[in-house]
């Protein structure tokens, strides 16, 4: 898409923050009792729909989680694994060796590691491994190529030949039979894309990693529930499988966003391409281990999450998606983005009101 498509992000951000400010301010500027039933109704809807989504996990739908048969090697499609790596000298060799040991026909599997302008020993390690393993293909980009992870993945697309693409992070870990089970799931559900449940490898490192492990499990539970009530499911970057034809039809990976997975999820939704969620096997990754890294990560997620609504909001209001999907998106937009900001404004107004009463 053109740069002009994204030029109104700041204006939309201002409008969004202003709306949150007003929603928090109006009850304080008036008699709050007048808004009691409105707040009560909204709270009931939020809790009720959340309980429905969670409860659906106790009735695991066959198409969501169980497989009636194992797909044969003859039926398996050609798969290209894509990994964008920058300064990953500590994990890249381990990743390559694990990928090469996955159960999958060797004539149907290609591994592409994109060296995205690394300044450490990653290029040297990849050069050595590419001479050692024929299935490994290394694609290199200059440090100033631009586009981030999306740019690296788009650059590698022209070298791929498979029907399906599996995007992994450099710290990803898969079970040996993950690919076989993944395509058995694809065949039964007729999905255009599939997201593997994410799991944490360093869960016992500290309190933060333990919390992230629980968070990932809860996210998968919500994803299951949303999908089972005909809501919206989303990709999560690491461990996302997508049909190459579908990706190209959607315009490839968006290089003008900080969360290409969330952006792509909405574009797939608008094109009526179905995203499945597979609980087992999971894709395992390392959780961030310190608070500064966690805050930076969450800031990026929040920014990218809002960007997609600003970019595609007008299309989401059209008939391209059904009413239940619109409700689901609205619900999680309010829950994840609007309510936290409204709560901050509300807290500020409450403290200001309390201080004013104290000084009277």
Locations of the language-model features?
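Catalytic donor-sugar/metal-binding loop of nucleotide-sugar-dependent glycosyltransferases
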Residues: 265-284
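Cell-envelope/extracellular polymer assembly enzymes that use nucleotide-activated donors
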Residues: 77-80, 110, 248, 263
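Acidic donor-binding loop at a coil-to-helix junction in glycosyltransferase catalytic cores
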Residues: 258-264
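A conserved acidic beta->alpha catalytic loop
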Residues: 115-124, 143-145
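Long helical/loop segments within the catalytic core of UDP-sugar-dependent glycosyltransferases
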Residues: 130, 134-163, 176-258, 295, ...
């Amino acid at each position: 898409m053109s740069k002009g498509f994204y030029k109104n992000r700041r204006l939309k951000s201002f409008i969004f923050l202003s709306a949150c400010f007003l929603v928090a301010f109006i009850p304080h500027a008036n008699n709050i009792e007048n808004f009691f039933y409105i707040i009560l109704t909204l709270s009931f809807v939020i809790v009720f729909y959340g309980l429905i989504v969670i409860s659906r996990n106790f009735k695991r739908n066959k198409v969501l989680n169980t497989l009636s048969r194992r797909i044969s090697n003859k039926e398996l499609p050609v798969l290209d694994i894509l990994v964008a790596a920058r300064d990953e000298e500590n994990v890249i060799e381990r990743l390559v060796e694990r990928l090469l040991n996955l159960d999958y026909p060797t004539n149907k599997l290609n591994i592409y590691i994109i060296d995205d302008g690394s300044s450490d020993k990653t290029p040297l390690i990849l050069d050595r491994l590419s001479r050692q393993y024929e299935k490994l293909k290394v694609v290199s980009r200059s440090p100033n190529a631009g586009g981030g992870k999306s740019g690296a993945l788009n650059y590698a697309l022209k070298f791929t030949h498979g029907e399906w693409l599996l995007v992994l992070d450099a710290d990803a870990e898969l079970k040996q039979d993950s690919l076989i089970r993944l395509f058995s799931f694809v065949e039964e559900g007729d999905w255009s894309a599939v997201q593997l449940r994410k799991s944490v490898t360093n869960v016992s490192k500290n309190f933060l990693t333990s919390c992230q492990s629980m968070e990932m499990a809860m996210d998968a539970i919500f994803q299951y529930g949303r999908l089972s009530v005909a809501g919206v499911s989303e990709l999560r970057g690491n461990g996302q499988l997508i049909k190459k034809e579908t990706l190209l039809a959607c315009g490839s990976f968006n290089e003008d966003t900080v969360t290409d997975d969330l952006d792509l999820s909405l574009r797939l939704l608008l094109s009526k391409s179905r995203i499945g969620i597979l609980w087992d096997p999971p894709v395992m990754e390392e959780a961030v281990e310190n608070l500064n890294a966690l805050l930076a990560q969450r800031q990026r997620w929040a920014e990218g999450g809002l960007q997609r609504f600003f970019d595609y909001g007008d299309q989401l209001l059209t008939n391209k998606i059904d009413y239940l999907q619109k409700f689901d998106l609205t619900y999680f937009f309010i829950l994840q983005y609007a309510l936290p900001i409204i709560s901050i404004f509300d807290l500020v107004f409450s403290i200001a009101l309390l201080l004013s009463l104290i000084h009277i």
